[in-house]
Curated annotation (Swiss-Prot):
It comes from the Eukaryota. The lineage of its organism: Eukaryota, Viridiplantae, Streptophyta, Embryophyta, Tracheophyta. One of its GO terms (molecular function) is DNA binding. Residues 31-85 form the HTH myb-type domain. Its main location: nucleus. It comes from Arabidopsis thaliana (Mouse-ear cress). Positive regulator for cold-responsive gene expression and cold tolerance. Part of a regulatory feedback loop that controls a subset of the circadian outputs and modulates the central oscillator. Negatively self-regulates its own expression. Regulated at the level of mRNA maturation by RH42. The RVE2 pre-mRNA can be alternatively spliced, generating a poison cassette exon that harbors an very early in-frame premature termination codon. The resulting severely truncated mRNA is not efficiently translated. One of its GO terms (cellular component) is nucleus. This is Protein REVEILLE 2.
Amino acid sequence: MAMQERCESLCSDELISSSDAFYLKTRKPYTITKQREKWTEAEHEKFVEALKLYGRAWRRIEEHVGTKTAVQIRSHAQKFFTKVARDFGVSSESIEIPPPRPKRKPMHPYPRKLVIPDAKEMVYAELTGSKLIQDEDNRSPTSVLSAHGSDGLGSIGSNSPNSSSAELSSHTEESLSLEAETKQSLKLFGKTFVVGDYNSSMSCDDSEDGKKKLYSETQSLQCSSSTSENAETEVVVSEFKRSERSAFSQLKSSVTEMNNMRGFMPYKKRVKVEENIDNVKLSYPLW
């Protein structure tokens, strides 16, 4: 019995919920406060006259009508044009719908980047007096390149031929200073080394390389040997020319490396190094 009562109560609850689901809700009552805009016959006649005079210039039509805004005139024109197109051939009145206004084309449709030239290019353009020639369509009016080129041409054209040599010297000095600034400096073990450009070093004259070789070859070979802890004697060898593959070049490199060794060294190790230097000198007699 208890089970039957529970089943009946559940069935009755389901029926009540289903009836609530199908129950239609009433719409919330509201009042229309803003009425539809009405056009009088006089306003419509003024509107048609303005259409014939000004076309789709809504601001001028607004001034001509006087009582309606441009937004209201535009919405009224859309309704009027649909009505004229619908009643075409039925009504005797022939009203020409003005064509839509052409869209304005932008002056620069895509953003353009300002190209900043390098310092070397600017110096070269000023020296030669030639500027980069580009099409007017591909160049913006506020271009940095055109401005620099015009300045360089104007300065060269205005100056006299007597002052051309002074200008060239000043420009060369500026270019040299710019190249010196571009060189990189490297600091290793408390010493600064200037790292130059590989291409510029390869493009040097052969005469300079020859001078450097002669200078390095003519340097004297100096060997230092200490006979006591306080006194040191230097042996200066006479100058001579040698080839790069000779044994004397290896001797010089080994001796200079040993002489340039700095820092603390134990006494026994130092004695061995000095003995090695003496042996090297004896094995390669210098004449």
